[in-house]
């Protein structure tokens, strides 16, 4: 899996980059059909200085996206990964259901 890491409006330290890439590797262990992933961290200058994590995952023609805003980058990354995990579960269930319906239709025709 190819992972692209981008930081906007700030310069990340190496620990943050490694943490984000390690989190993406956990998703890859769950589903090996991930082709590419992009992690974008940004900093919104507001009263509370919001940290935003955007994670895009490409899975065989489908793009999954999760965006989280919290007060820390680690929390934002974790929350976005949890969202993507749920999306991957739904995607895998959808693929599994499609294969079952195809078998059922063939049996009904016979």
What residue ranges belong to the model's regions?
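N-terminal, polar/charged subdomain of small-to-medium soluble alpha/beta proteins
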Residues: 1-110
């Amino acid at each position: 899996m190819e992972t692209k890491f981008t930081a906007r409006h700030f310069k990340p330290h190496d620990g943050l980059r490694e943490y984000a890439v390690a989190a993406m590797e956990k998703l890859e262990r769950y589903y090996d059909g991930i082709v590419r992933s992009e992690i974008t961290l940004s900093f919104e200058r507001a009263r509370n200085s919001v940290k935003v994590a955007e994670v895009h995952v490409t899975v065989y023609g489908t793009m999954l996206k999760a965006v989280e805003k919290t007060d820390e980058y680690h929390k934002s990354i974790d929350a976005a990964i949890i969202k993507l995990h749920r999306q991957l579960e739904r995607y895998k269930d959808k693929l599994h259901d499609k294969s079952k319906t195809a078998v059922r239709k063939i049996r009904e025709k016979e």
